[in-house]
Swiss-Prot record:
Protein name: Putative hydro-lyase BamMC406_3459
UniProt entry tagged with the keyword Cytoplasm: no
EC number of the protein: 4.2.1.-
Family from the record: Belongs to the D-glutamate cyclase family.
Keyword annotations of the record: Lyase
Lineage summary: Bacteria, Pseudomonadati, Pseudomonadota, Betaproteobacteria, Burkholderiales
Organism of this sequence: Burkholderia ambifaria (strain MC40-6)
Amino acid sequence: MTPSEFRQSVRSGAFRQPTAGQCGPFAQANLAILPNAYAHDFLRFCQANPKACPLLGVGEPGAFRLDVLGEDLDIRTDVPSYNVYRDGRLTERVESLEALWRDDFVVFAIGCSFSFEDMLAREGIALRHIEEGRNVPMYRTSIPNRRAGIFGGQLVVSMRPLRGADAIRAVQITSRFPGVHGAPVHIGHPRELGIADLGAPDFGDAVTVRDGELPVFWACGVTPQTALMEAKLPLAIAHTPGYMLMTDITNASLAVF
């Protein structure tokens, strides 16, 4: 299935699941959508936190199509699930933004670690959340983001349990792709990140961590949602964690070496 065909399946309501493992050679994107009045500070926030918020594209006010991300792409309809925040609180999840869309909305598309999972799988590195048919586990850490204006919050990380040799190979592979979070930020000791229980993720689903495996943590594009919550904007929108926008950008084109 091509990315365009996948987006059409989302738009028609046929696909409403987490997007890990879909259209493997193509990059997926996190979304943050907010009024133009706050867009400059949010852009500065992303630039100050490039590990968690690597920008793939930024739209013009009111634009719900970003040609840099793909043809026949509609931000309002092509994500399986959206989070709607009002005054910093998650008030609802919706499957379309057509009724909520405003002429002053600015779209920020942020790289997603689902993008490099295809490369890991090609190297024979098994990914537990895909094996178990679950959403990837994501955790809010105790590490503060670099603040920009009203935007701060804490770093969010995704976790994949790997054996030592696979963890080393994963570092080597993902280091080539800073546009989709790059190398892990931590391996092995969740408490050093302020994570008390791997079995209780803040977002996504818990997965099995087997004996002899290390939890490997990558910076996560859900990080901006902690900033949106802390800023308490009257209205802001994001993807539901794990339910991403499929782009036409090839993962290979994002490699830096």
